[in-house]
């Protein structure tokens, strides 16, 4: 993926704009619980409150390509031209989130505390999901930083939400510190 800063061009009457350039991330393949969808984490995360180290939470890791060029596991149907012809196997995957003008959009941005310029903040909070130890997955969602309580019975343990912590490795450890809880923001335009 060749991402060289801000992309702005006109296609008909719509403006296309690069909002996030970053690292593809998701649940660890070897863990049964936690989040169940892929996200694009920005190159420049923003932190708020966090507890260093691992707690009873969900986690998120960088996505690597699992694309074999030969052998019985051969499954690579992708061009490697953008990688200098080098194999993609076990390499971290980049990502991008773009905006197409002229359409109503609501966007959840993980690892950010502020919306892009020209966007409206709906709410800010922390990334949440099912816990990694609970044996099943749920979507990563942005949970309001000041949650409210609904009517209903308590302590039923039927569906649960936990903060999501970073696991670095495929995510660069210099900016994504293992054990930190991820922020998020929901923006509209």
Model-derived regions, located:
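Folded, disulfide-stabilized extracellular/luminal domains of secretory-pathway proteins
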Residues: 4, 11-177, 181-189
């Amino acid at each position: 993926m060749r991402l060289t800063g801000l992309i702005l061009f006109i296609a008909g009457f719509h403006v296309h704009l690069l909002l996030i350039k970053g690292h593809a991330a998701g649940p660890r393949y070897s863990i049964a619980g936690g989040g169940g969808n892929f996200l694009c984490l920005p190159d420049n995360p923003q932190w708020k409150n966090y507890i260093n180290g691992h707690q009873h939470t969900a986690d998120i890791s960088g996505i690597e390509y699992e694309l074999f060029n030969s052998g019985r596991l051969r499954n690579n149907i992708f061009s490697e031209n953008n990688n200098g012809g080098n194999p993609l196997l076990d390499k971290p995957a980049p990502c991008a989130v773009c905006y197409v003008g002229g359409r109503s959009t609501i966007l959840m941005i993980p690892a950010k505390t502020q919306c892009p310029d020209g966007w409206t903040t709906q709410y800010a909070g922390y990334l949440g999901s099912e816990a990694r130890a609970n044996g099943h997955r749920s979507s990563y969602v942005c949970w309001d930083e000041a949650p409210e309580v609904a009517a209903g019975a308590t302590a039923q343990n039927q569906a649960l939400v936990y903060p999501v912590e970073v696991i670095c490795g495929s995510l660069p450890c210099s900016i994504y510190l293992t054990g930190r809880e991820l922020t998020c923001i929901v923006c509209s335009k």
